[in-house]
Amino acid sequence: MATALRAADKPVRVGVVGVGERGSGHVKMLLDIPGVEIPAICDINTNRLDAALTAVAAAGRPKAEGYSRGPEDYLRLIARSDLDAVITATPWELHTPIAVAAMQAGKYAGTEVPAATTLDQCWQLVNTSEQTGVPCMLLENDCYGAGALMALNLVEQGILGEIVHCEGGYEHDIRSGILRNGDLSWRARESVRRNGDLYPTHPVGPIAWWTNINRGDRFDYLVSMASKSRGRNHYIRKYFGENHPNSNVKFALGDVVTTTIRSVDGVTVVLSHDTSLPRPQSDSGDSKIPLMVIRLQGTEGIFAGSLDRIYIEGRNGPNSKTHHWQGITPYYEKYGHPLWKALGKNAAGYAHGGEDYLCVQQFIAAVRHKVQTPIDVYDAATWSAISALSEQSIAGRSVPVDFPDFTRGRWQNRRKIAFILE
């Protein structure tokens, strides 16, 4: 009750930049979190901006001001004195500039994924956060899935033993988004000029938490390889015709990109990026991490989140020598993460099984209590850097590429993730 009263007395004031599919979802969630106001919204698409402004008014909140004069009108929004935080859900190339400007203005920065597309941008985020003392949180929702958090709890309790290997893949058929009004979408244009794992943070976020990356261990180096590129052109020709203006566009991005990472402590991680070939979405009613392959292997057992299966040696039935999978559902009662047990009911009904809500709620809680965000700027830089590093590796015929140490040595003594229960 004390927290609720405090939230009501002093609302967290958030500006939102970009209200397309993701940003409009953020607006809805922010309006549903007690003690949050949205004084300002920015988008160059006036139709989307008007819809977001209408949503704020319909929720009975104070009127929000709109900003739509041009691609950099977010600077006027950030300059306002009545904002505590800024959330960006724009195309990727704007994530870093907006987050940097927000931190320089003394406002918490919450950025959609990835936080950066180049190593220089990664360092801009780190340097700005360190210089200003203002947190920057990557809004990586997949870290907050019920399954991902339960796996974290299993790791922290030692149930899976010492972690040796993880696998994760963003395997999501998004070909329907290649064209927008007959032309290449902004995301498709990224695929024209870049060849690497362009969207690594969904799988690597939970994996980094499970393996204490930047908190006792760090990624050392990676090797990446890309398949040939066929899926996007095939899709355009099949559904829009051989004579479509974009049917012969040369896409640099391979259909499947595979990256292997090794940590300083010797943990290996295999990531895949696969978004341009036919595949159904997860249809498992019990799935907690849809659209991804995710696996966590320890010396005592294995968690296969995308299959909703687990095996712990010696705990599977009366014959401990029998090797067989168990469903993960019974494990939630005993090993469900405290964050989900405390706030899971609030998250019910929101996108991606509620993980979107919990992610944004944790950002708001950090702003409200003026503490560090659970996913901090070092995580944002490290996870996002995989894109640029994988591009380097592929361009060099799959040469090993070292990870920068964005923590500058502090990874050895940094505290574990601090969740905020309120």
Task: State the predicted function of each range.
Residues 105-118:
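ADP-ribose/adenylate-binding Rossmann-like module
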Residues 88, 111, 136-138, 167, ...:
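Hydrophobic residues in well-ordered beta-strands that form the structural core
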Residues 134, 161-165, 393-409, 419-422:
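C-terminal capping/lid region of NAD(P)-dependent oxidoreductase domains
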Residues 1-108, 123-135:
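N-terminal glycine-/serine-/threonine-rich beta1-alpha1-beta2 phosphate-ribose binding loop
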Residues 231-250, 258, 262-263, 300-375, ...:
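C-terminal glycine/acidic-rich active-site capping loop/insertion
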Residues 253, 267, 272-290:
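Glycine-rich phosphate/pyrophosphate-binding beta-alpha loops
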Residues 18, 22, 132-137, 142-251:
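Predominantly a Rossmann-like dinucleotide-binding segment in NAD(P)-dependent oxidoreductases
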